Amino acid sequence: MADLEKINKIKVAEHIVECFGGIKNIKNIDKDLTRIKILVDSNSLVKRDDLTKNDNIIGTIKSNELTEVVINFEIIEDVYNKILYMMNEQKQ
């Protein structure tokens, strides 16, 4: 069961990255208890409507230059860390 949960968290992270136009479009990422806050190079690449097609994503909030992804608090830490890992891999 643990492996299935891990795979699900990875899929959520990959879904978020895809909906934000790919890892190259993500400039910065931050989080709080229920939201992953993402700053992108190009907002035109962000597919907000597609984000909520994943059951773990509750909604999105657009504020200034950031888009906040409201996510299941039980998995936010792992999803955030996976996106950070993907960003670091891209830089290498």
UniProtKB/Swiss-Prot annotation:
Chain ranges of the PTS EIIB type-1 domain: 10-92
Localization of this protein: Cytoplasm
Keywords: Cytoplasm, Phosphoprotein, Phosphotransferase system, Transferase
InterPro entries assigned to the protein according to its UniProt record, in alphabetical order: Glu_permease_IIB, PTS_IIB_1
GO terms of biological process kind: phosphoenolpyruvate-dependent sugar phosphotransferase system
Any one annotated GO CC term: cytoplasm
Enzyme class, UniProt record, top EC level: transferase
Main location class: cytoplasm
Protein purpose: The phosphoenolpyruvate-dependent sugar phosphotransferase system (PTS), a major carbohydrate active -transport system, catalyzes the phosphorylation of incoming sugar substrates concomitant with their translocation across the cell membrane.
Domain-level remarks: The EIIB domain is phosphorylated by phospho-EIIA on a cysteinyl or histidyl residue, depending on the transported sugar. Then, it transfers the phosphoryl group to the sugar substrate concomitantly with the sugar uptake processed by the EIIC domain.
Protein name: Putative phosphotransferase enzyme IIB component BB_0367
Source organism: Borreliella burgdorferi (strain ATCC 35210 / DSM 4680 / CIP 102532 / B31) (Borrelia burgdorferi)
